[in-house]
Amino acid sequence: MALLPILEFPDPRLRTVAKPVTQVDDSIRQLVDDMFETMYDAPGIGLAATQVNVHKRVVVIDVSEDKSQPLVFINPEIEVLDEELSQYDEGCLSVPGFYETVERPGHIRVKALDRAGNAFELQPQGLLAVCIQHELDHLNGKLFVDHISPFKRSRIRSKLEKKHKAGVR
């Protein structure tokens, strides 16, 4: 396994729309393993392949406290089951050090393939539902900062650009 470099906002590669995985093979399973290692090391609770500059529709998530519930979503698709919105303070490994309140549907259905290529379906609520939507945004070239005001987004961009110019990670 290997740690992968995580792209940081405003890197334009984060805006790339990921392509579907055509076959779940050893290279995809290796990517999944590397993504989990990277996510746990960061530390984070979710990581999309786009964030590590691999533009395939692959997401890894583990919202457990003890890293005991790893979930893999390959070619995920979501359906909103309840239009009622939930508010969560979201952060992102690609927008380090910033957290903002984002509204998202609180109950969804997700269909995807697992690490072995088997189809599955979940109906998560709460934090897991929010995390899945956040990571799927990455696969579609979106970031959580796209859900906040242009002023706040501009402020975050400016602070991160200054940090990058100073060579701080």
From Swiss-Prot:
Its EC number is 3.5.1.88. Its cofactor is Fe(2+). It comes from the Bacteria. It is an enzyme of class 3 (hydrolase). One of its GO terms (molecular function) is metal ion binding. Keywords: Hydrolase, Iron, Metal-binding, Protein biosynthesis. PANTHER family: PEPTIDE DEFORMYLASE. Removes the formyl group from the N-terminal Met of newly synthesized proteins. Requires at least a dipeptide for an efficient rate of reaction. N-terminal L-methionine is a prerequisite for activity but the enzyme has broad specificity at other positions. This is Peptide deformylase.
